[in-house]
């Protein structure tokens, strides 16, 4: 898999500076769902950060955008990898009201925000490039979407 790359940003500087690069074992996630790509800024918890992101892989209905979750420590070491796509609701599946922005895209679930809300976690995301959604997951549901990377 591609390494986790951390960047440092200091206002009002608009340049992102490399802060570290960390290799990790994705246990075959990339081979099935594609490499992890962009997503929401990391959200802190008691001893690290959660990062909701996405990957893209070919499917019979077109390229499918899968939401995923990983966790890393403040020093950048990835401690938990996705054990599959993050199960976010999509009642529309591949149906759209408008023409596709990307003619090759099938189902698109694109995470854009992650925030703690009491004991739960709120995840904002886009569906098929035309709808926005909000899912609230409990801490156990979040933890079930990842597996610990052996030390």
Regions found by a protein language model. Name each.
Residues 76, 113-114:
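A short, hydrophobic secondary-structure junction motif
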């Amino acid at each position: 898999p591609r390494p986790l790359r951390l960047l440092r940003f200091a206002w009002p500087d608009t340049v992102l500076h490399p802060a570290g690069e960390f290799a990790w074992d994705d246990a075959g996630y990339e081979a099935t769902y594609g490499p992890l790509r962009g997503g929401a800024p990391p959200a802190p918890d008691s001893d690290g950060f959660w990062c909701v992101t996405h990957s893209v892989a070919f499917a019979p209905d077109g390229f499918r955008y899968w939401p995923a979750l990983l966790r890393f420590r403040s020093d950048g070491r990835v401690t938990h990898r996705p054990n599959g796509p993050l199960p976010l609701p999509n009642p529309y599946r591949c149906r759209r009201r408008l023409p596709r922005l990307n003619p090759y895209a099938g189902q698109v679930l694109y995470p854009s925000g992650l925030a703690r809300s009491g004991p739960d976690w709120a995840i904002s995301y886009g569906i098929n490039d035309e709808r926005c959604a909000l899912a609230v997951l409990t801490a156990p549901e979040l933890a079930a979407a990842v597996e610990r990377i052996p030390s």
